Amino acid sequence: MGLLSKKASCNTHGQDSSYFWGWEEYEKNPYDEIKNPDGIIQMGLAENQLSFDLIESWLAKNPDAANFQREGQSIFRELALFQDYHGLPSFKNAMADFMSENRGNRVSFNPNKLVLTAGATPANETLMFCLADPGDAFLLPTPYYPGFDRDLKWRTGAEIVPIQCKSANGFRITKVALEEAYEQAQKLNLKVKGVLITNPSNPLGTTTTRTELNHLLDFISRKKIHLISDEIYSGTVFTNPGFISVMEVLKDRKLENTDVFDRVHIVYSLSKDLGLPGFRVGVIYSNDDFVVSAATKMSSFGLISSQTQYLLSALLSDKTFTKNYLEENQIRLKNRHKKLVSGLEAAGIECLKSNAGLFCWVDMRHLLKSNTFEAEIELWKKIVYEVKLNISPGSSCHCNEPGWFRVCFANLSEETLKVALDRLKRFVDGPSPTRRSQSEHQRLKNLRKMKVSNWVFRLSFHDREPEER
């Protein structure tokens, strides 16, 4: 260890949480309907597998894009050599158009202000490098995505100060909570450089309201700080209220040519809306030319392959496909969400009312032995090791109330979801009085048998004892 850098040998990587531990346990014993039916079911993975068939169908109908051809001629060599280092113009244009379409075409995006990154993770980290120095802080509303402890802090040296949101108002962001977080940062001698939100929220599965967005814009205006809006779930909104991008609020308030406009930055990717996390496609959109320039230089450390850009530029440019995909995907998400909520209700478990995302924020406070985070982790361990479901405890999301859990629903089949819900219901119900009675009766019966057998054995032993001597 002495030969390694402090960065490599430190334990500030943010992965020492129950969120990542649950993944490790799942990987040791993954559920498989045939090969391992008693394994752990993965419900801690926010992955959208519900509409993969739509993309596969498009690929089958568009062999040129899938096979890296143009008018039937291979362009593999062209794509394999150096292209525009920071993005194919065709892909940037297609991405900007898709982002606008995804927001109801109520706002438009300039492709020249897009910075391409290998996913949303480096997009968020790059913005931290651009906006904060080591020791500076960003305010994040709780609960928040557990990976931010790694993504925002580890390499950048930035700090996170939580904006404490409460279940009493559905974990909404309030003026008071914003001010309290800012004051807390000052008490810690941390310079606040901005606020980062996920809209729709991960892990809540709710869209940020116009009122909240106005509070945030007023707040960053007063404090002269930045706002990062991570909008990677914007296409997963499956019921009202609809998604409102912060860009739409800026436009409605006619703030386009103000300093506030330049301090608002968007993060987007295709990992959630299109279910393509393996393609590693992320975007930074900023109104600040200096941020765009700096982020573009930094993006050299995590580029998107030319092959990926070529394929996706063709897919995103097919407006018939994108329109159908977004509509059908939302229908499927709504149906799957309904199945999860119904199954949880059958087990006596409620969820925060949600309208977006690939997960539910599940209320298991009534199952805790005590109102403590220790009790929450104890319950979580039972669910992982006994029920064999990997879900994410609220404490890993920095929720300030024990007993909440994030449960994902779009990464598994309907049949596997049913198995998971059946397991959870059996766990919550516990042994029924009838089963307990039968079990106790069987235990006493076995005990009597054992006593009789022991008595017979002893009797037989004493009868034989003289002979054996």
From Swiss-Prot:
One of its GO terms (molecular function) is pyridoxal phosphate binding. It is an enzyme of class 4 (lyase). Induction: By indole-3-acetic acid (IAA) and cycloheximide (CHX). Optimum pH is 8.2. Its EC number is 4.4.1.14. It comes from the Eukaryota. Keywords: Ethylene biosynthesis, Fruit ripening, Lyase, Pyridoxal phosphate, S-adenosyl-L-methionine. The modification N6-(pyridoxal phosphate)lysine is found at residue 272. May be processed at its C-terminus. Substrate binds at residues 47, 85. Expressed in roots. Expressed at low level in flowers and siliques. Its cofactor is pyridoxal 5'-phosphate. InterPro entries: Aminotransferase_I/II_large, Ethylene_sulfur-biosynth, NHTrfase_class1_PyrdxlP-BS, PyrdxlP-dep_Trfase, PyrdxlP-dep_Trfase_major, PyrdxlP-dep_Trfase_small. It catalyses: S-adenosyl-L-methionine = 1-aminocyclopropane-1-carboxylate + S-methyl-5'-thioadenosine + H(+). GO terms for biological process: ethylene biosynthetic process; fruit ripening. Pathway: Alkene biosynthesis; ethylene biosynthesis via S-adenosyl-L-methionine; ethylene from S-adenosyl-L-methionine: step 1/2. Homodimer and heterodimer. In vivo, the relevance of heterodimerization with other ACS enzymes is however unsure. Interacts with GRF3. Belongs to the class-I pyridoxal-phosphate-dependent aminotransferase family. The stability of ACS proteins, and the regulation of such stability, play a central role in ethylene biosynthesis. 1-aminocyclopropane-1-carboxylate synthase (ACS) enzymes catalyze the conversion of S-adenosyl-L-methionine (SAM) into 1-aminocyclopropane-1-carboxylate (ACC), a direct precursor of ethylene. This is 1-aminocyclopropane-1-carboxylate synthase 8. It comes from Arabidopsis thaliana. The lineage of its organism: Eukaryota, Viridiplantae, Streptophyta, Embryophyta, Tracheophyta.
